[in-house]
Amino acid sequence: MKIPRWMIEFTGHTMLHNRPPWFVYRPDIHKVRGADVRRILDTVEPGDILLRRFDGYLNTIFTPGFWGHAGIFVGDNQIVHAVSQGTISEDILNFCRADAVCVFSVVNLTHPKPQIRLAIDRAMAAADENIDYDFDFSGLNETYYCTELIDVVYGYLFAQDYVKKFGQLILMPDGIYKSKCVAIKLECKP
């Protein structure tokens, strides 16, 4: 019995789900592949900022702009970022399971080495404390959303990149992307 090609492809890209409609069709689970991740690993340095994007997810729809999330590379293959579970340290390989990733170096620092070291130390301390996620995006509390964490660890370097969204000033991932405080080192948008 010969199985049609379309059926093999369809069943290979369809995932079972525990709620209706019971199936999810994802022909490309993640577009950033092994070769892309190798280039990221060869490029990234401690203190670099990474942005990522997932296609087809609700949070991507609700986050204005192309990029949806930010983290800081702290060395030892670890990214620190703020997620709904709090501020965490995660393996860079897990962070890069996405549909697009961009790596930036921070530029125009007056004392680059000590400022980057301080940013890394602040990020690691936030992860060690597992600082809560800032669900109200107020900036007036001791919790962080992803890009706010990046701004705080770099001593409010991105203050000029906030935009008014949802009735308050918010640093969007695209704000970091367009900032004069960073330089793109690598962009993977397969």
Segments predicted by a language model, with ranges:
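Cysteine-nucleophile amide-bond enzymes
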Residues: 1-190
